[in-house]
């Protein structure tokens, strides 16, 4: 049996980043169970300050995960990206970057869509037959 993977991304605003990437990848933000969270608080395992309201839902403040929607619906083994709150800011260059595969879509069209949602265009590049936009 193969192993599954969770990629963890440190973020100042994990819930907003999870929303953005879920929309970009056409994945879903993993639901959090407000009743379970309230239960953990009432039993003394968690405190109110460890929670927040995001888009009208009670969630854990420190993180949000995204998964392919079909994995959530089918309860498939977890492949997920977890965005977790990091108190410190970034201090050095990112050691990981994400290549968003376009599956035949026009890269300029996708660039415009991502910019409209808050991404920043940095530069375009080409190597042999491959070309891309670098964005942040």
Predicted segments, located by residue:
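Vicinal oxygen chelate
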Residues: 2-9, 19, 23-25, 31-32, ...
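Helix N-cap motif at beta-to-alpha junctions
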Residues: 13-14, 103-107
């Amino acid at each position: 049996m193969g192993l599954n993977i969770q990629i963890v991304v440190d973020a100042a605003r994990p819930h907003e980043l999870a929303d953005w990437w879920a929309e970009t990848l056409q994945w879903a933000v993993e639901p959090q169970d407000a009743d379970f969270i309230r239960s953990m608080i009432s039993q003394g395992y968690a405190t109110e300050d460890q929670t927040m309201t995001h888009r009208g839902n009670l969630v854990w403040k420190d993180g949000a995960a995204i998964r392919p929607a079909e994995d959530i619906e089918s309860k498939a083994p977890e492949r997920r990206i977890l965005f977790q709150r990091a108190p410190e800011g970034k201090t050095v260059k990112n050691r990981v970057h994400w290549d968003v595969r376009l599956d035949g879509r026009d890269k300029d069209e996708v660039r415009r869509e991502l910019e409209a949602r808050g991404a920043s265009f940095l530069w375009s590049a080409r190597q042999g037959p491959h070309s891309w936009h670098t964005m942040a």
